């Protein structure tokens, strides 16, 4: 358990812009002291839940614009409880929110379960992890260097 003396410090610098349909929703938040991702909530009308049928996907608004600091990205990831209990997960995972993107963050959900799933206003639907970005100089070569592994992939190292 984290006490105020040993709780990890939050790094300042994430600015959010609340959109009109995000009014009244809690800010994205880290639900525990050790959480890596902040939970994102559905910014749907209270009287219009969204039903995602098995095999269907839906784009769910969060009601916020995130001003991700330069040199970082926001990674949209599924919530494990929704995936395990209902088969609800995020497509394009992790989805990347670039630091220069200034539109509303939306979450692309898919229902891999057997039952319809209702997304309601304020429901925690995904999480966002803020991570540093490394950009490399890109150059073309005439051939690849040799390694012990070579071009082996897709199970080439075995399972045991």
Swiss-Prot record:
Coiled coil: none annotated. Its cofactor is Mg(2+). Substrate binds at residues 79-81, 92, 96-98, 106. Pathway: Pyrimidine metabolism; dUMP biosynthesis; dUMP from dCTP (dUTP route): step 2/2. Its EC number is 3.6.1.23. Belongs to the dUTPase family. This is Deoxyuridine 5'-triphosphate nucleotidohydrolase. It comes from Rhizobium meliloti (strain 1021).
């Amino acid at each position: 358990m984290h006490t105020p003396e040993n709780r990890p410090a939050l790094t300042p610098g994430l600015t959010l812009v609340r959109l009109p349909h995000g009014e009244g929703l809690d800010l994205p938040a880290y639900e525990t002291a050790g959480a890596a991702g902040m939970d994102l909530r559905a910014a749907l009308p209270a009287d219009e839940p969204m039903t995602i049928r098995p095999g269907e996907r839906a784009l769910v608004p969060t009601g916020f614009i995130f001003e991700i600091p330069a040199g970082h990205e926001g990674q949209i990831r599924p919530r494990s409880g929704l995936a395990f209990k209902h088969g609800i997960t995020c497509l394009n995972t992790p989805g990347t929110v670039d630091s220069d993107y200034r539109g509303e963050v939306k979450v692309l959900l898919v229902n891999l379960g057997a039952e319809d799933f209702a997304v309601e206003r304020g429901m925690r639907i995904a999480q966002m992890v803020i991570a540093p970005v490394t950009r490399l100089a890109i150059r073309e070569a005439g051939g690849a260097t040799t390694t012990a592994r070579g071009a082996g992939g897709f199970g080439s190292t075995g399972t045991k």
